[in-house]
Amino acid sequence: MVMFKKIKSFEVVFNDPEKVYGSGEKVAGRVIVEVCEVTRVKAVRILACGVAKVLWMQGSQQCKQTSEYLRYEDTLLLEDQPTGENEMVIMRPGNKYEYKFGFELPQGPLGTSFKGKYGCVDYWVKAFLDRPSQPTQGTKKNFEVVDLVDVNTPDLMAPVSAKKEKKVSCMFIPDGRVSVSARIDRKGFCEGDEISIHADFENTCSRIVVPKAAIVARHTYLANGQTKVLTQELSSVRGNHIISGTCASWRGKSLRVQKIRPSILGCNILRVEYSLLIYVSVPGSKKVILDLPLVIGSRSGLSSRTSSMASRTSSEMSWVDLNIPDTPEAPPCYMDIIPEDHRLESPTTPLLDDMDGSQDSPIFMYAPEFKFMPPPTYTEVDPCILNNNVQ
């Protein structure tokens, strides 16, 4: 019977554990081994991998696909470590043995580290400890990679605009139309940027409508000729009600890009895309939706912002740092300060549900309930009787 020797410690440690790597950069670290008793080691090996994987069940069929970005193998050696017979390393208790490693990530596009419901992009280093007459022992450590997406390219700095009109009917009788046109100054943004929205809304139907905007993520998984798409709302902002026969405009309505992963556009089995949806909720009818594509980058484009955007950011930073605005501003609209940002708990939740979780779009206009003033306070003690008793 073979007795298995226990290893006290066997781990992969990176030189910079918090670092996020990019293409062409060097990943360096060491494999640390400590033993409980004298142990002979044939070799310490590492395998570094970067793989995109998608997997889901469609009926009884398993849809599965992989795409490899990185594969690196090496056998590590100790520095100035005596070896025994057959070139084996003799490890003794109380000592710490460190095997250094280093490799460069491939040049060119790499998939950004990502974990989704039906797929992921993972990078890791796995170490193997080979011992005679003992099973190979392994340990694994993940590291993070971000594919650099430069939002300062001419294509991503160009404005994006769209417009749409919808005819509304009630019981097959025409009931006017709802139209929306919108524009944003650029297509590429980074985490923390403010999207300045310029939009015009017109409502000629008999219903009250509500304009809103939302940043939406779309995760697309492809395998075996099948496609799975999940959509998730990340943050949103809304405007005031637009009554029948009126128009409304947004001039620089602001929506902040939350902490999200950069777009993944170069992978052939997994994509992460973002959009700005500007839409109008019409009671009893489908929404009027504009879809403006966004690219979320990993390299800031602050140097190329417009002066209005720069002044807006500067004003907000002054408010945060000094708690005193540089110049007095008009108070915000009440509806603008109501927190509307929310994240769907499940990616399978329908996007932009017709009910919107609130009753802020009544079909008919109504007057608020009239409330009478409360009666004055009174007492059951007659003041006249009280005065007579005193006299």
Curated annotation (Swiss-Prot):
One of its GO terms (molecular function) is ubiquitin protein ligase binding. Its main location: cytoplasm. It is found in: Cytoplasm. It holds the Pfam family Arrestin_C. One of its GO terms (cellular component) is cytoplasm. Ubiquitinated; undergoes heterotypic 'Lys-48'-/'Lys-63'-branched polyubiquitination catalyzed by ITCH and UBR5 resulting in proteasomal degradation. Deubiquitinated by USP5, leading to TXNIP stabilization. The modification Phosphoserine is found at residue 361. InterPro entries: Arrestin-like_C, Arrestin-like_N, Arrestin_C-like, Arrestin_domain-protein, Ig_E-set. There is a cross-link at residue 212 (Glycyl lysine isopeptide (Lys-Gly) (interchain with G-Cter in ubiquitin)). One of its GO terms (biological process) is negative regulation of cell division. Homodimer; disulfide-linked. Interacts with TXN/thioredoxin through its redox-active site. Interacts with transcriptional repressors ZBTB16, ZBTB32 and HDAC1. Interacts with DDIT4. May act as an oxidative stress mediator by inhibiting thioredoxin activity or by limiting its bioavailability. Interacts with COPS5 and restores COPS5-induced suppression of CDKN1B stability, blocking the COPS5-mediated translocation of CDKN1B from the nucleus to the cytoplasm. Functions as a transcriptional repressor, possibly by acting as a bridge molecule between transcription factors and corepressor complexes, and over-expression will induce G0/G1 cell cycle arrest. Required for the maturation of natural killer cells. Acts as a suppressor of tumor cell growth. Belongs to the arrestin family. This is Thioredoxin-interacting protein. It comes from Pongo abelii. The lineage of its organism: Eukaryota, Metazoa, Chordata, Craniata, Vertebrata. The gene is TXNIP.
